[in-house]
Amino acid sequence: MERKSTSPAAQVLAPAVSEIRSLLEASRKNVAQQVNQELLLTYWKIGEVIVRYEQNDSIRAAYGEKTLSQLSRALTKELGKGFSRSNVYNMRQFYLSYPIFQTVSGKLSWSHYCELLSISDKEKRSFYEKEAVNSGWSVREMKRQVESSLFERLLLSRGDANKEQVLALAEKGVDYNKPEDIIKDPYVFEFLGLPEERPFLESDLEAALVRQIEDFLLELGRGFMFVGTQQRVTVNNSHYYVDMVFYNKILHAYVLIELKTTKLTPEAAGQINMYLNYYAAEVNDPEDNPPIGIILCTDKDSVAAEYALGGLSNQIFASRYVLYMPNKEQLIGQVEEVLKRWHSHEDE
């Protein structure tokens, strides 16, 4: 006998549930838009303050080209996250590119504008801004359209019919914005002073590796301090997360660790070097030494540990860092210990 999917009581309540859902969705959308509008206005005002103070002769004489870097450090120390050098630079550019705030669309997020600010041509930037508003493009979709040279293709097309065809093709794969997309934007978490939602580790095995490596380095007694897991790195308006970050107080250097449950690949090496460049430019204090990276890879056949030095020379690493860092054999031993426990549980 076939069961009915809904009870009579549920059917009676369905209109009320639908109306309440509509009210809640509308309210969430309004809240998201209000937060976004306030964020944009605040960052625009901060940009105006930066430009105004840059014109101060004493500040220009004291810091010169390093003004933004010094300001970024001062703001981060005083106010917390949200004031990386790149974000402070974008606030400045936001004000310079949109000197009249009323021309800024509240329908686009700060992440949208960070992407738009990378477009130097004013007409081209205006085109993508309007299309993003009219078509409801997400940041990811807008980036895809920019990379596909939609603006240039439209310029080359002849006649309105061809332009409509190009636009229609461009709309394929559109990922429209939702209120929760705005609220979950890392920039919004920073603006509101809320703890950021971090991605979960890919597997229980990676979580076990994190615990093992953290305990090992802290017990090593060579100046390691644990900063955290899944630490965000924002490069070209794209967000990435470093698996583990330590700071060595003896070396005055950050140590970034990436865990991979696959063989070591060139892509993994390139990714951690990108993280190292970010930390050197955005996180390091003037007295800090260059950061270093460690990649730990494990698959069915082997375990590997590799150091990533970024811009650091092998000679400096050998003379200054090696004494305080674990060697590859020690790191591999820690991974193998976790794998041994892991496989013994699987066999039970």
Give the residues covered by each predicted segment.
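Basic, low-complexity intrinsically disordered segments
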Residues: 1-348
